[in-house]
Structures are given as C-alpha cells and as structure tokens.
C-alpha cells in the first residue's frame, strides 16, 4: 500500500496512459506500526502489554532492523508517516479518484492495549490498517474491513496457527479483494 501510492503518484506525474482503477491494501501500516515505533524508540516493550508473542516480534525486528537498508525500518513508523510533514501528507491528492479498500487483521487482542496498536495482525494494528487518522485529503474514498486474521502465513506459522488464519491465505478476505477489483 505505501509503495503503490508512490507508484500511482509517479504514473500521474508522468501523465501515463495507465490508469489505476482501485487500490486494496491488506495490513498496510498507513499510520505506522508498533514494530517500527519500538525499533526507533518511540515506544517501549510495555506497548506489548505482556503479550509474549508481540514482545518477541518487537525485539527480533529491532535486532534485524540493523541489517535492513538505511531508513527501511523507519518507514513503518508513526513518526515518518503521520503529521503535516509526514509521508501521508505528501500523498494528498494521489487517491482522489481512486476507491481504496483497507483490510485489517484483528487476530491478536489485549485488555489494556493502546488503540493505536491493538488489536493487530501480528505486525499492524487495525487502526493503522484502516488509516483511521489519515485525513480525507489523503484518503477520500475508503471502505474498511476487519477480519480476525494474522498478517501473513509467516505470522500464523510463528504462533502455530493454520495458514487460513492469515489474511493472505483466507478465502473470505480474498473474496473482498476480488470484489474490490471487480467493482472498480
């Protein structure tokens, strides 16, 4: 979702004859993710509210971020994406004529977890996947869906769940994707 908006912007700037009729995102961190925010030090381990799996994800991602290209881990942070000078603001107008379907996963829940980070799909919260605080100037035509699913089969495997618990492997989720494409 994040990179596709940049590609759509370039197509528009180049006056390409190629027209994007719709955009569908699955678990895209429109407003960042707890993983990114933890990696750059904007939140501490308490954001996991004692959830052992999320604590492991946070610490492992932080350790692996050192091997990523410079800035890659920062691109999925609230600090980078939000606010008047954030990446989302730079994308204002790009999606004006494009219907956007936003799909979030709520497989993981926690009592007392901050709404910014909970529920989530193992990496991205429903709030971020639904772009709840992204201004209408950036995202004017949105439809949202939530499924009690993980981000991917990688996350499902990590928690010992069947692959069909992943958004990327669930036929109900994929039906929504197909409908969004067909309706564009």
Describe each PLM feature range.
Residues 2-7:
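Hydrolases whose catalytic domains are alpha/beta-hydrolase-1, hotdog thioesterase
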